[in-house]
A protein has these predicted regions:
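Conserved alpha/beta cores of soluble small-molecule-handling proteins
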Residues: 1-125
Length: 125
């Protein structure tokens, strides 16, 4: 992971935790071009995600309907989501809370052999 400053939010992107401002979605990503993806949001209460498993179950129903395989299972998505919340806890105001979001796109819509490093689904938490 790149150097992290104490005031930067952390995200999980395609298998790695990184500063949120370093998450880069290619401009040819199908979610950007066509809205071809799914998302869900879970609110926290006192820093704890509310009904996260239920949100993730609903999210995976959407992914199955869209026939997008994010490459990780629901249990991993829950664990990574909880870890994102934990890694950002020090930034939460005393009376504040978060929304933790899961976003999955079908991936890059490559034209020809352009050499994209990642052509599978893009997963962001």
């Amino acid at each position: 992971m790149a150097q992290q400053l104490s005031n930067q939010r952390i995200a999980w992107f395609n298998g790695a935790f990184m500063p949120e401002n370093q998450v880069m979605i290619p401009f040819r990503d199908r979610s950007w071009k066509y809205g071809d993806g799914a998302f869900d949001m879970t609110r926290t209460f006192e820093g704890a995600p509310f009904r996260l498993k239920e949100h993730i179950d609903r999210f995976y129903r959407s992914l199955r309907y869209l026939q997008i395989d994010p490459g990780i299972g629901p249990k991993e998505m829950v664990a990574h989501s909880e870890e994102v919340v934990a890694k950002n806890e020090h930034l939460r105001a005393a009376a504040g809370d978060w929304w933790v979001g899961q976003r999955v796109s079908r991936g890059v819509d490559a034209v020809g052999d352009e050499g994209w490093d990642h052509t599978g689904p893009n997963v962001v938490i």
